[in-house]
Amino acid sequence: NERRHRLHEVVRLSGMNIIIDDDDYPLIIKVASLPGMRLQVYFLDNEEFFKRKFMFHDEEGKPFADNEDRMVFFCKGVIETIRKFGWPADYIHCFGWMTALIPFYLKTAYKNDPILNKFKIIYTPYKEDISGFFTPKFLDKASINNLEPEDLKPFMKNKDVTLIEGALAFTDGIIIGSEDLDESVTKAIKKLKGIPVLDYVPLENMKKEYMEFYNKLIEE
């Protein structure tokens, strides 16, 4: 509810555009306050990409044809918003396939940024993954800031797009988000060397386990 949570546009950040495949898309940043908590939540918006009745699939359950573009827009938009605010942070925690490009971008396109190159990156994979509906054209769309499609090789396997496995290759820590993961993802995690992994944690234990994991990772 926009009125209840006082959701409104951050006007001073308006005017930013995200380029995808040579097309410009305006990035609208909104903020809301959670009742009873001293916490603000920021939202990235674009009417063409996100003003829909369903999130990732249409009413027949078919993934939207522009999910590739929406993902690139979201991932780059998150990073550019952090840069715009100048937020220093100890870590950034990315959840699911929709954020899979963020660890990659932070370790490549933005690796020399003085604000972003100090983050510890944590990635949480889930069972849900729509990589199978992505096309090789995704590599061109995701090649931002002088990156080349070849730089995204970790996101390809046997000519198929593998979003989650790609993200895992650029993370500093992993927290499993589902009790059951795809076998290929489980194998990819086991192959990683020196990356701390927190197995799936039930909701009632999540706060304690996650904080311990965060603190241990930051101290390393």
Residues of each region from the PLM?
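Catalytic cores of nucleotide-sugar-dependent glycosyltransferases that transfer UDP/GDP/TDP-activated
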Residues: 1-220
